[in-house]
């Protein structure tokens, strides 16, 4: 099935809504609750306004399942992320006299090289978790802008960069490894979300895993909203149809129908078998 968002993560939502319709004819001990956030893709902007209202308004759920494309593998962990913007300052002047002025792009270029050097350091001697495809925290500069004309020395440049950190590392400590105190640069936080590190010894996960009929559990490289729920003490897991690596965020995003069938089957089994799963705790 081809369509924007089919993998990330409307396929999961379709299965959940279908299961909700079936729940109308059942009398579960606890309700089947659905929480829909907004602006997740541009920085998890909606969930901070929602998460503190979940328990007061809906009660304490036994399990929170966050739908993301894991190919229906149970995911118990992902890294946290902080997005930053560095504003670099220089002096405007005619390029014929360029050596007489501070070039904001040079300040930005030096900073970008620092992020690259720090990335090498983290890969070599930083904390590790081999359950991840990239088993260490990462620093990535993704956008650089500056200058208005070739014959003008730039007085301002911007660098957008991020830190994706293991849950055992504080992003502030990683940021402090960079030279952020220069009078020629100002760094601000754009957005952030927490990582997820679920208690893998919880017997509930083994029973939940049995409902999927696929190998696991796993940890994923991309971020989700799961860490927000876990942070307020809720038992949280990530699972959903489709593959982020091969299907998500692609020009012709799509999802295999078989993945939707597996997700739909999982939702049905979960609704009928949830109480027996939870009795193991």
Identify what each model region corresponds to.
Residues 1, 31, 186-188:
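Short, basic/glycine-rich phosphate-binding loops at helix/coil junctions
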Residues 2, 65, 140:
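Conserved Rossmann-like nucleotide-binding pocket used by diverse enzymes
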Residues 76, 83-281:
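Metal-dependent amide/peptide-bond hydrolase catalytic core
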């Amino acid at each position: 099935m081809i369509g924007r968002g089919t993998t990330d993560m409307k396929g999961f939502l379709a299965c959940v809504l279908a299961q909700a319709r079936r729940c109308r004819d059942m009398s579960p001990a606890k309700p089947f609750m659905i929480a829909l956030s907004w602006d997740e893709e541009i920085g998890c902007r909606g969930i901070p306004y929602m998460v503190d209202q979940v328990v007061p308004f809906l009660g304490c759920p036994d399990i929170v399942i966050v739908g993301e494309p894991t190919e229906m593998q149970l995911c118990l962990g992902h890294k946290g992320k902080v997005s930053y913007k560095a504003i670099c300052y220089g002096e405007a002047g005619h390029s014929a006299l360029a050596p007489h002025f501070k070039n904001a792009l040079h300040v930005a270029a030096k900073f970008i090289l620092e992020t690259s050097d720090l990335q090498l350091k983290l890969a070599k001697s930083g904390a590790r978790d081999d359950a991840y495809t990239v088993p260490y925290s990462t620093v990535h500069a993704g956008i650089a802008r500056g200058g208005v004309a070739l014959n003008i020395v730039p007085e301002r440049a911007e660098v957008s960069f991020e830190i994706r950190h293991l849950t055992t590392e504080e992003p502030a400590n990683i940021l402090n490894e960079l030279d952020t105190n220069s009078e020629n640069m100002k760094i601000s936080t754009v957005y952030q979300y927490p990582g997820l590190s679920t208690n893998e010894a919880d017997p509930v996960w083994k029973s939940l895993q049995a409902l999927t009929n696929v190998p696991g559990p796993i940890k994923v490289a991309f971020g989700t909203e799961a860490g927000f729920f876990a942070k307020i003490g809720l038992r949280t897991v990530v699972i959903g149809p489709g593959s982020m690596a091969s299907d998500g965020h692609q020009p012709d995003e799509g999802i295999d129908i078989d993945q939707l069938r597996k997700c739909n089957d999982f939702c049905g089994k979960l609704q009928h078998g949830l109480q027996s799963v939870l009795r193991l705790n």
